[in-house]
């Protein structure tokens, strides 16, 4: 199962946004990977992995999980929602 989303976070996935995203991904009931479109996937719960993506505002990323069912859907929905925000708290 996968979802594609455009990063709306003004700072992109760097430093604090990357840490918050990794924390949110790690709290999900299923493992999730993230990749820039056409790039290699990394563990979405890994701050360093996320930072190596170099995803900036406007970049398209793919979120993917091997899981199925409601947990997988909810996990991807939550992470898409996070990336769709312009600012993170």
Residue ranges of model-derived segments:
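Broad hydrophobic/π-residue packing in well-ordered secondary structure
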Residues: 1, 27-28, 86-87
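Intrinsic-disorder/low-complexity, polar/charged segments enriched in Ser/Thr/Lys/Arg/Asp/Glu/Gln
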Residues: 1-4, 60-62
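Compact, glycine-rich, soluble single-domain proteins
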Residues: 6-49, 53-56
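C-terminal structural segments of small proteins and small subunits
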Residues: 51-89
